[in-house]
């Protein structure tokens, strides 16, 4: 499927951060045309149906749940992960960065969204290590 968006200066984090064990397809900018913009609330390691925590303190497992939630919400809106144009990643400990980004990379391989990462002092629940919000533009 052709990319519905124009992605500028694509790169892979294995090149930009060779000292880290990462493999994320990202880009510097995304231009969209038409379509519907889907703004995702920051997704956390909990069920979308009942807000129950997943009960893991492993950053990779938490990130899998966060990315599954993101994928599910985009699909419920009629899109796919290829329509993801931006993510903002919040982590509570810089030591979790590689695990979080490696796991996220499994979900965005070939997508190349723009990405911003922040280390924050805390998230809404003490057990949460990662939160990711996203923006998708789904073609009409």
Regions found by a protein language model. Name each.
Residues 1-85, 92-140:
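N-terminal presequence-like segments and the immediate start of the first folded domain
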């Amino acid at each position: 499927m052709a990319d519905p968006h124009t992605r500028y200066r694509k790169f892979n984090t294995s090149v930009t951060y060779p000292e880290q064990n990462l493999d994320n397809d990202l880009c510097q900018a995304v231009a969209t045309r038409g379509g519907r913009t889907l703004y995702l609330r920051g997704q956390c390691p909990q069920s979308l149906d009942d807000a129950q925590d997943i009960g893991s303190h492993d950053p990779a497992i938490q990130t899998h749940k966060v990315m599954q939630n993101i994928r599910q919400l985009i699909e419920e809106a009629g899109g796919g992960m290829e329509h993801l144009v931006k993510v903002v990643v919040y982590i509570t400990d810089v030591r979790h960065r590689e695990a979080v980004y490696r796991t996220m990379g499994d979900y965005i391989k070939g997508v190349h969204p723009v990405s911003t990462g922040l280390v924050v002092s805390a998230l809404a629940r003490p057990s949460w290590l990662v939160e990711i919000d996203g923006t998708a533009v789904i073609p009409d």
